[in-house]
Amino acid sequence: MGHCLTKNQQDKDESDHHVDFAGANVTVITTKESWDQKLSEASRDGKIVVVNFSATWCGPCRMMAPFYRELSEKYPSLMFLVVDVDELIDFSTSWDIKATPTFFFLKDGQQVDKLVGANKPELQKKVIAASDLVPHVQN
């Protein structure tokens, strides 16, 4: 399991900004307003939100990104978000992010679970558990 500390960041190369973090059913949150909108949407739709607090310069975050996208495709009953800790510094600080990646699981805007670090098996286990809490509706 790996993680990057959010303090004393390495030199950032902006050319790869958000590379590999978005896609599939993953939404990159770039403003507090988009965060509020997505949480409101999730509450309305009865979805649990999985939030990945991440950084483009963080090796373990980059390693987890494709796996996170795969999970978003496999579990469409959940809402998958990514917050770049460097873009939303004050917001990330308000969530007490000490290391990246940090994953939060939210139901109706409240934390129901958390995982710190790039631990694929544990993330998958928590996503499956969260998915089991969501009523599955056939269209």
Regions found by a protein language model. Name each.
Residues 34, 63-70, 110, 122-125:
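Acidic, Ser/Thr-rich intrinsically disordered and amphipathic helical segments
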Residues 23-29, 55, 74, 82, ...:
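Intrinsic disorder
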Residues 30, 53, 64-90, 97:
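Thiol-based oxidoreductase modules, predominantly thioredoxin-like and allied folds used
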Residues 1-47, 122-139:
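N-terminal leader/targeting and pre-domain segments
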Residues 98-139:
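Non-catalytic, surface beta->alpha helical segment in thiol-disulfide oxidoreductase systems
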Residues 50, 68, 80, 90, ...:
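A short, hydrophobic beta-strand/beta-hairpin element that forms part of a small beta-sheet core
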